[in-house]
Amino acid sequence: MAKIQFSRGLDEEVIPEVRLTRSRTGDTGTATFIFTNPKILDQGTTEDITGMYLIDEEGEIITREVKGKFVNGRPEGVEAVYVMKSAQEWERFIRFMERYAQENDLGFSKS
């Protein structure tokens, strides 16, 4: 049931690239989601992007830091940043990502 939405009720089908950073103390972190040609930018979609909603059985994680990427005046992608300000937020985010990865056959690699 783990899913990502940019507009409530409209599930995003494009799987993002996710980049994680974490402080040395483990208290804070940042997740950057990069979507290439997401469904929300399709010509037929009239919904506004109101944020990025990470939804699973525990509830939802919300970020409003969402930006569109344009090439030659055409929408090409969406980049969203979620900032985790505590170890609890980090752990909650990781639980969501584990569910999302399992449902979408994704892997994790350290760089």
Curated annotation (Swiss-Prot):
Gene3D superfamilies tied to this protein: Photosystem II Psb28
Taken from the UniProt record, the cysteine pairs bridged by disulfide bonds within this chain are none
Q: Does the keyword Secreted apply?
A: no
Gene Ontology biological-process annotations: photosynthesis
Tell me which GO cellular component terms the UniProt record holds: photosystem II oxygen evolving complex; plasma membrane-derived thylakoid membrane
The subcellular location is: Cellular thylakoid membrane
Return the protein name. Photosystem II reaction center Psb28 protein
Sequence similarity: Belongs to the Psb28 family.
Q: Which domain of life is it from?
A: Bacteria
Q: Describe the subunit structure.
A: Part of the photosystem II complex.
* Keywords per UniProt: Membrane, Photosynthesis, Photosystem II, Thylakoid
Q: For this UniProt entry, what is the primary localization, expressed as one broad class?
A: membrane
Q: How does the record say this protein sits in the membrane? A: Peripheral membrane protein
> Record's PANTHER family?
PHOTOSYSTEM II REACTION CENTER PSB28 PROTEIN, CHLOROPLASTIC, PTHR34963
Is Membrane included in the keywords of this UniProt record? yes
